[in-house]
Amino acid sequence: MLFIVFTILTCIGVKEKSNVDMQTASIKDMFKALVQNDQAMTVVITIVVVNMALYITSNLIIYFFKYDLGGINWNDGYALFNMVGGGTQILAMMILYPFLRNLCKLNNIKIFYVSVCMSIFGYVVLLIMATMGVNNVLPMLVPGVLIMASAGMNNVIITVFLANTVDYGELKNNRRDESVIFSMQTFVVKLASGVSVFIASMALELLKLKNLSDAVTDDAIDFSASVSAASKMGLRLVMTLIPIAGLIFALIWFKKHYILTDQKVEEIAAEVKARNA
């Protein structure tokens, strides 16, 4: 109680004196700055779609192991898949991206294309394996590694792309909206997460898997035995074809609208520096 009282007194009684007359941006100005920066909008839309693809799969993968692969040890397979996928994502950020960038001498745009194509290939392999009736987790790790390695590289590349749009926006709009642009990354990730949860929930409802997932929690039961072949196929298609469609759209959208190559970024940085000199 004393802590709360003294904290309130400190907040009320101690005020920082600021001698800086700083113009702050309103919410309207923030969205206006984002809309006026076409390259930032391109990257933001790309982030939303790419993350939606990943989150749809991550939301449904537990149901895939539980109701499709099945078996009484499905939870062990799911845990192994998650562990390998998470480790792969970290290693991709730390090792694979620097390898492609520094040793293979690929620019960030080409790395992004490689990353998205790798993810699409992973989804295709996952769908083929599931359709062929593969029920062992070890082969499933192959597409999992491809998808999560792509996700790890995308985490790095998207941040770089956003950073590139800051100087572009300053040159175009005479305002450096750095905080606005980078704050949008968190917002769009949350947006993608929310939309993907909605899609996953709708899929579970339509495939009649939602009630099953809430009803029984006994790990010693093979849940896949009570699921129809149509529901299993529907689950496979939702968690692979929708992400594939999203990634293809993101690839086409990005290729059509993003213009900030490494050379262009250097030119813009030089122009901004000369303007501010």
Give residue ranges: language-model regions.
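Membrane-embedded alpha-helical bundles of multi-pass transporters/translocases
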Residues: 1-277
